[in-house]
Structure formats: C-alpha cells, structure tokens
Amino acid sequence: MNDILETETPVMVSPRWDMLLDAGEDTSPSVQTQIDAEFRRVVSPYMSSSGWLCTLTIECGTIICACR
C-alpha cells in the first residue's frame, strides 16, 4: 500500500492540446473549454456504466463525483 503513495501519478495531456501549441497559437491546456471537453471524453464512458456523475473543479483541480 505504501508503494502506491510513493509512486508519481502519471499526467495525461490531450494530443489536441499538443497540436494547438505546436501550431504556434496562444492556446494552452488551461483553457476551460478544452479541459471540459477532454474531461467529458475520458470520463463519460465510465460514468454511464457505473451510475456516477462526475465534474472537474478547475479551481482546486479535483474531481467531484456523486451517485445518481
């Protein structure tokens, strides 16, 4: 159990963000609409099968979930 706490959490970055940044636009992953879209894309399949409803709070960077 202690090993889990000591390992570094992997960070997932959307390939779409990388493309926008490489294109030279002043767009970053912190843009709320991009974060919301990626969150829905990644989390939606799990929410529909599990009965949980989740949202991401950008201020704290936390995921809040509630059972339907």
From Swiss-Prot:
Chief subcellular location: secreted
Name the record gives this protein: Lantibiotic michiganin-A
Protein's cellular compartments: Secreted
Position(s), cross-link Beta-methyllanthionine (Thr-Cys): 57-65, 62-67
Organism: Clavibacter michiganensis subsp. michiganensis
Gene this chain is encoded by: micA
Single GO biological process annotation from the record: killing of cells of another organism
Role played: Lanthionine-containing peptide antibiotic (lantibiotic) active against S.michiganensis subspecies sepedonicus strain 2136 (MIC=30 pmol/ml). The bactericidal activity of lantibiotics is based on depolarization of energized bacterial cytoplasmic membranes, initiated by the formation of aqueous transmembrane pores.
Family: Belongs to the type B lantibiotic family.
One cellular-component annotation, GO: extracellular region
MF (Gene Ontology): signaling receptor binding
Positions of post-translational 2,3-didehydrobutyrine modification: 55
Lineage: Bacteria, Bacillati, Actinomycetota, Actinomycetes, Micrococcales
Keywords annotated in UniProt: Antibiotic, Antimicrobial, Bacteriocin, Lantibiotic, Oxidation, Secreted, Thioether bond
Chain positions listed as propeptide in the UniProt record: 1-47
Site of covalent link Lanthionine (Ser-Cys): 49-54
Post-translation changes: Maturation of lantibiotics involves the enzymatic conversion of Thr, and Ser into dehydrated AA and the formation of thioether bonds with cysteine. The 62-67 beta-methyllanthionine thioether bond is oxidized to a sulfoxide. This is followed by membrane translocation and cleavage of the modified precursor.
